[in-house]
Amino acid sequence: MTSEERTKRSYERRPYPTTNIAGLVDKGGSLPLLKWMQAVGRPGRSAPQRVLVAGCGTGVEAFVMRRRLPAAEIVAVDFSPRSIAWAQRLERAADGVRPITFRVGDLTDRKIADVVGGDFDLITCHGVLSYLPKPSVVLENLAACLRSGGALYLGVNGEAHPATRLRPWLASFGLAVDELREERRLRELLGLWDALNDDGSGELATMSSSYLGGDVCGPHFNNWSLARWRSEANRVGWEVAGTDVLPMALQLAAERKNDRVLYPAGVGELAARLDQARPAGFHRIMLRRAPAGALAVTRAGEGTRPLHWTGLYSVRFSQSAERRTVKAVFNCAAFHVRFEHELTAGQQLVLRALMAAGVAPDGWTKQWNRTAEGRRLLWLWAGLGVVAVGDAAGAGVRG
C-alpha cells in the first residue's frame, strides 16, 4: 500500500474534525482573513462569486467561507466519503443559507475539474498538501479549476512544524509513527513532550485521535521550508503573492534597516529568504498564476502590471514644518504591524490619490522612481502588504 493510499485510509477511519465544529466555525477555523486573501491574491477585484474548498474534511472551512461570503457559490471536495457524509449531515441541519455543494473527489486526479467544475475565483486548500507525496500534481490540477484572475490560498506545514522533531523522538522509543496504533503509549510520550516544549502547538497529549492520526502519526509529511513550497508552485505556474507572516518578519528587519540587503527581491523570494532565517511551523500562502518573479513591484506601473492599494493599513499623516516633509504612520491591526515613513509633499499627494482610487494611474510610480530611496520604499510597501501588484495588461478582469 502506498503512502497516499494509507493517508486516505487514515482519514476515512478518522474524519477530521468531528468535535466542536460549531465552535471552530465561529472562530473562523484556521483560515486567514478574507480581506488579506483578497488584497494580495486578487487585488482590485470584487468579492469571489465561486469558491472551491479543496480537501474540506468534515466541512469546517466550507462553513467558514459561507459565513464570510453568504452570496457566493461554494463547492467543497474531499477524498474521504465518510468526511463528506459528515459534512452533508451538518449541511442538512443548516437553515436559511445558500447550500454548499459537497463532492467526493481526489485532488490528485487529473479529472478533478470534472467533479467540482471550474471558473472559481478563489480556491482554499488548508492542511492538505503536507500529507500527499506529490503536491505539485494537486497544484497543477487546481490551476485548471481557476478563473482568470483567481487565486489559491494554501495552508501547509513549515520546516519548524513540531512533527519535524517530534516524530524522530517518538520513533526513538520504538513507537510506530507511520500510523496511529499504540494510542495510550503515544499520549504518555506526548505528555512528556508537552511538559518540555512550549512551541505554541498546544497540549498535544489532549488532542483528538483524528488529529494525532493525521498530524503526528501519519504515513507521509511534507514539512518544508517556504522556499521549497515556492519551488513546487513555480514548477506548475504559480507564484507566491504573500504570506501571513511576511509583513511582521519584514518589519522586524526594516526597524534596523536590515531589510536593505534583501532589495529588490520580489515578494515570493523575499518571503522565502526570511523564512530561511526564521522558519515557520506553518505557512499561510497566497498563490497567483504568474511566472516566478513576475509579481515583483519593480515590474509594476507604467501600463504593465498596475499597482493596487490593499486597504489592509490605515494611514495617519502629520506635517513636519522643520523638515518640509510629511510623516505617514501606517497601522495594520490584522497583523499587528505599525511603522512610519517620511514622505515628500509630492509623495504624500500621490499616496493619498492611490488610497482614494484603489489603483495607481499611469505615471504614478515616477514619484518613487526618482531616487533610490523612493524605489526601496515602494518595494518595502509591497512586501509589507501596503500595495499589491495586479494582473498583467490584457489578463482579463472578470470577477
Which residue stretches match the model-derived regions?
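Class I SAM-dependent methyltransferase SAM/SAH-binding core
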Residues: 50-52, 60-109
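A short acidic, Gly/Pro-enriched loop at the edge of an enzyme's catalytic core
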Residues: 112-123
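A short SAM/SAH-binding and catalytic strip from SAM-dependent methyltransferases
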Residues: 121-134
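A short glycine-rich, Lys/Arg-flanked "PGG" loop and its adjoining helix->strand segment in the class I
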Residues: 136-148
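Conserved class I S-adenosyl-L-methionine
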Residues: 153-192
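Substrate-binding/catalytic lobe of Class I Rossmann-like enzymes that use SAM or dcSAM, i.e.
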Residues: 179-261
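Acidic, low-complexity/disordered tracts enriched in E/D and polar residues
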Residues: 271-354, 375, 379, 383, ...
